[in-house]
Structure formats: C-alpha cells, structure tokens
Amino acid sequence: MLKKENCCLIALASVPLVMTLGNSMLIPILPTIEKKLHISSFQVSMIITIYSIVAILLIPIAGYLSDRWGRKMVMVPSLLIAAIGGAITGWVSWKVENPYIWILMGRAIQGIGAAGAMPVVIPCVGDLYKDEKQVSTGLGIIETSNTFGKVLSPILGSALAAIVWFLPFWAIPVLCVVSIVLLLVLVKAKKQEGEVPPLKEFIQSIISTFREKGRWLIAIFALGAIIMLILFGILFYLSTILESKYDIHGIWKGCVLAIPLLVLSLSSYMAGKKIGDNQNVMKKCIYIGFLMAAASVIIPLFIKGIYLLLLCLVIMGIGIGMALPCLDALITQGIEKEQRGTVTSFYSSMRFIGVAAGPPLYSFFMKGADHEVFYLTSIFAAIGAVIAIIWIKPAKDEKTVKQKPEPTS
C-alpha cells in the first residue's frame, strides 16, 4: 500500500471507530440510565434503537449523494451533525429535569449524522485501491476499527459514567471533531470525472444491477441485518445480566463485555488479511462464522455459569469476526464504482436494522428464562448459515471488475 493510501485509510478507519464508540459506549450504561430516568428496560433500549431507525431511513440517500457529490463531501457534514446530536443529548441529560424525550431527539439527530458517515466508508475503501486483495485488507482494517470501537466502548463508557452518568454523551461530539480533522487533513477530495449521469439514468442502472445480481445482493443484505441483530442483542443481554445476575458493575463490567469483542476484532483483522480476492473462501468464512455463532449458545442451554458463557461468546465473536469483512468485500468488489455508494448504502441500512431490532427484541425475550435468548440467537444464526450456503454463489468464470487507483473522495 502506498503511503498516501495508508493516510487515507487511517482517516477512514477513524469514522467507524468514532461512530461505534458513540453508540456502543451507551450499552454498558443502559441499566444505569434506566435507574436514573426511572424508565423501563424497553424504553432504555429505544435510546439505541431510535438512532438506528433514523439512520436506516437516510443511509440510502447518503449513499446516493456520495456517488454524486463525492464521499468526503458527505462524510464531513454528517460527522458535524452527529456531533451536534451528541452535544444536545449531553446537555439535556445535564440540565433538563425529565430528559428522556429530549435524549431520544438528540439521538435521532445523531442518527442523521451516522447515516452519512460510517456507511460511506465501505465504498470509499473500494475506490481507494485497484488491487482487490488490498481492498479486502482495507475492509478488514475498517471492520477491525469498527469492532475495536466495540471493544473500547464498554470500558470507556463505564469509566466515563463512573464520573457522571451522562458523561458518555458528551464524549460523542469530541470524538466526531477528531474524525473530522483527520478527514480534512488526510483525505483529498476527488474531482468529478466526466459528466454525472442524469438521475433517471442512474436509477435505471441501479435497477439493472439488482436485476442482474439481486439474489446474492439481497442475501448479503439479510446476512448483514442478522449478524448485527445477534451482536447487539447479545451485548444488551450480557450488559443486563452482568448487573442483575452476577452483580458486576462499572469498569469491571466494561472489561467483561470487552472480552468477546476483542476476539471479534482480532478475528475480523485476520479474516480481512487472509481472504484476498477469493470469493469461495469468503463464502466459507461467512457460513462457518454463522454456524459457530449458532453452536456457541447451545452449551449454555444445559450448563450455567459466567465463565462458560463468556467462553461461548468468545466462540461467537470469532465467528462473527470471520463473517463481517467477507460480507463487506463481496458487496464492494461485486459492484461498479459509480453505483457502489448507493448499493452499499442498502447493505449498511440492513445492518442498522439489525442494530435497531436487537436490543428491544432481546429485551422482550429476556422477560422469560435465559434459554429463550439462546434459542433465539441460535435460530437466527442457523438461518444466516443457510442463506449463505444456498444464495451466495461466487462466480467461477466471470472476471472481477478491476478498479483504477484514485484518491478517495
């Protein structure tokens, strides 16, 4: 990789890191927020969900605009909006007597910013390199940054909340400003090449792409939703039972939450390095990863204990980590650059649907016994494995599209 490309990748990797911290940092403190605001478990889960719902609706628009205006022109203002949303959430938590509704409004604004930030990074990496092995490696680094944010977030969130419960909200605008500076300094805006196609022609090209590649694209969209639903649902479950069942609080709780996420991060990095441009290997990593996630929660159905549960979640982390960069690589390498931002935005929307659905869905099943949560997880993961095996069919004879190296926009 060239030095210039490395600098761009560092700046781009800061975006998922910051966006993940801004969301996942709240997971370990949700029980604390529930107590401070005197709200239900479902209501507190909506603090995560409202952010994702808004992002889901706006991500396709952001993807389209990034194809038309350039990636950087969309990401920087979006990060600024996310910073404003975080600042509003922090301020109302500090100054308003009953801030729950205002917190949801601030989180909704943060979701608007998130729609144009993290999802645009994936097509950005595809634009950056012409060698698809480098694209896979770059996407592995992006997913590693994303998952490292999940590793750091429970520790950082718990540490900040130990000072003042709403301090994690104030960390969001600070982190966004850091990422904005990196993008402005290290990423050069790309000049528009040739004429921009009319909107009608562009939409027709997207429709044509879905007609030609719809089966495997929809499969990857579904897998993206399932994998994030499982991940955020299990994190919500673990965050809750660590306090209610095992009496683990504060930074220690954050450290426990970080264990499976650290393994997930390392697994993502290794998978991104190893898969190269081999789509058959990508498919195997995806369905094996889902099978590992499905199998990991079978043992806790019969044998109880925090250590065994953590071991099983580590196995799940390995599986999810294997699958994530492969999903990114398949969708990025299979789409033309001119349509990449729009098509990958649908994939990102589906991932956010999983993020939005996970906590409230798991909250509902947590009203019963623990085994209901494990059954739910295993069923979703098994469905994901079946989808990957049946509907993802790597092309054997088609030549993969090679991209020209360009500065990222």
Question: What is the predicted function of each stretch?
Answer:
Residues L57-E97:
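Conserved MFS/SLC helix-loop-helix module at the cytosolic interface between two early adjacent transmembrane helices
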Residues I141-L186:
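Helix-loop-helix hairpin linking two adjacent transmembrane segments in secondary transporters
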Residues V281-L327:
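C-terminal transmembrane helical hairpin of 12-TM major facilitator-type secondary transporters
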Residues R215-L257:
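Extracytoplasmic gate region of multi-pass secondary transporters
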Residues M1-L2, K188-A219:
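Juxtamembrane intracellular "pre-TM" segments in multi-pass secondary transporters
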